[in-house]
Amino acid sequence: MAIWFSIGAIAVAFAQSSPARIENPKVQGKNVDRCADIDGVNDCSARGQSKAASRICIAYGYADQVDSHWHASSGVATHYISQYDMHAGEVKGRWESRPSDGVFDWVVCKK
């Protein structure tokens, strides 16, 4: 009995810590732009894409992103804008609708 309980506890712990894949993520009801504003500049490099994916995960209640994939797509999408405080550094940013050339297909998030 104790062995089955231990196996069950391990399975539950693993399930809680394993990454979650979010297909076609949406924020504010819209697809999410692959780019993010960092330091006041639209950044579509790996850094900007990582920031946008991380913010998607946070919006879904996860701690951070592990991986992501996007595809080219024209139209309007939700775009993440980092905000900074002179004393505190980066503070909570905001989401805004903007024209986009690519949106996320999926994001893998971790707790």
Regions found by a protein language model. Give the residues of each.
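Secreted/extracellular ectodomain signature
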Residues: 15-111
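Bacterial N-terminal signal peptides
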Residues: 1-9
